[in-house]
């Protein structure tokens, strides 16, 4: 096999970053991204894009930390380059606050973000309902800019994009030698995975340019994330809810909660509502599967199920997925020894 033909199904931040990593790590390959939705219509486009890790209960902490560190380092390099504006990546400082002292005062990712420290009593006076807080600088990755930036890199290295809805991964055989499944919630159908389910997230995007620091309730439910063109206010966490239409009551609750943390938001204007469905499962699925029909085989690398933590770990998990693809390519290129029987 000369050129390995690789299809990546899914064009959110997970699919595109995986395609970039494959093109870097796997020699002599062609990469095609196939999806029925590309930016600006993906779930990733709704995400606020703050690098504050979600914890996966079924994944060892050292693995999660490695994923986060690799992602942080990748985006930090972009933030410190001339590409930062085009890629939508920048540093942002702020506070994560708690109404009771958390059991883990120093989270596993504290030495990856910049300047992590306990908030002072003077800082906590801004939040009278809160008793404990963490101050740090992290990165914000804005997908409406970052996804086109990734696409540009994929096409620049000879990759392709194809707008098409896939009903069955086997459709891609024999046109492709290897398939990488980054379809998120689509994996309920494409991989028969009943463990994955939607968690609906609604956010507001508002104009409030005076808000320069992020504020996040330790529960992760209420947050204020300033960006380059707007401030994102959140949020909701509705398990099993497939509704993509904005809910007016949700919007009122979000605005009320965020104004309680930052009263100046009463003056915010140009409020836009956005909804996305996070692909939740107990842990990210990073696994190779060999599909077989009628004596034919199709290696599939599954890479999905990041929930609300996708942007925080996307590059780390994409590197791992690319390594699995590299193993598949090596296996396909290794001749099967002839039997002496």
Curated annotation (Swiss-Prot):
One of its GO terms (biological process) is grooming behavior. Inhibited by the benzodiazepine olanzapine. Inhibited by aminooxyacetic acid, thiolactomycin, malonate and meso-tartrate. Clozapine, haloperidol and chlorpromazine have no effect on activity. Not inhibited by sodium, potassium, magnesium, iron, calcium, cobalt, copper, nickel, manganese or zinc ions. Not inhibited by AMP, ADP, ATP, or cAMP. Not inhibited by pyridoxal 5'-phosphate. Its cofactor is FAD. Selectively catalyzes the oxidative deamination of acidic amino acids. Suppresses the level of D-aspartate in the brain, an amino acid that can act as an agonist for glutamate receptors. Protects the organism from the toxicity of D-amino acids. May also function in the intestine. It is found in: Peroxisome matrix; Cytoplasm, Cytosol. Its EC number is 1.4.3.1. This is D-aspartate oxidase. It catalyses: D-aspartate + O2 + H2O = oxaloacetate + H2O2 + NH4(+); D-glutamate + O2 + H2O = H2O2 + 2-oxoglutarate + NH4(+). It comes from Homo sapiens (Human). The keyword Flavoprotein applies. GO terms for cellular component: cytoplasm; cytosol; peroxisomal matrix; peroxisome. Belongs to the DAMOX/DASOX family.
């Amino acid at each position: 096999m000369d050129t390995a033909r690789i299809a990546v199904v899914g064009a959110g931040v997970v699919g595109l970053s995986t395609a970039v990593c494959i093109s870097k790590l796997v020699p002599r390959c062609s990469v095609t991204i196939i999806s029925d939705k590309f930016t600006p219509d993906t779930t990733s486009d709704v995400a606020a894009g703050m690098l504050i890790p979600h914890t996966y209960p079924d994944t060892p902490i050292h693995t999660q930390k490695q994923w986060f560190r690799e992602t942080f380092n990748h985006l930090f390099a972009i933030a410190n380059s001339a590409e930062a504006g085009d890629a939508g990546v920048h540093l942002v400082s702020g506070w994560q606050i708690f109404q009771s002292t958390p059991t883990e005062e120093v989270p596993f990712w504290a030495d990856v973000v910049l300047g992590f420290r306990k908030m002072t009593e003077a800082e906590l006076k801004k939040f009278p309902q809160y008793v404990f807080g963490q101050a740090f600088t992290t990165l914000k990755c804005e997908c409406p800019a970052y996804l086109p930036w990734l696409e540009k890199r994929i096409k620049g290295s000879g990759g392709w994009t194809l707008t098409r809805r896939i009903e069955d991964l086997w459709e891609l055989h024999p046109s492709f030698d290897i398939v990488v499944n980054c379809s998120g919630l689509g994996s309920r159908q494409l991989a028969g995975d009943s463990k994955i389910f939607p968690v609906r997230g609604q956010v507001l995007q508002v104009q409030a340019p005076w808000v320069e620091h992020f504020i996040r309730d330790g529960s992760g439910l209420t947050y204020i994330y300033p960006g380059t063109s707007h401030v994102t206010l959140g949020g909701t966490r509705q398990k099993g809810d497939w509704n993509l239409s904005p809910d007016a009551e949700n919007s009122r609750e979000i605005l009320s909660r965020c104004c309680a943390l930052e009263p100046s938001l009463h003056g915010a204007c140009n409020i836009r509502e956005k909804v996305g469905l996070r692909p939740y499962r107990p842990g990210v699925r990073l696994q190779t599967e060999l599909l077989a029909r009628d004596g034919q085989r199709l290696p599939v690398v599954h890479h999905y199920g990041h929930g609300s933590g996708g942007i925080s770990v996307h590059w780390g998990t994409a590197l791992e997925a690319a390594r699995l693809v590299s193993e598949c390519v090596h296996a396909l290129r290794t001749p099967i020894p002839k039997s002496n029987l």
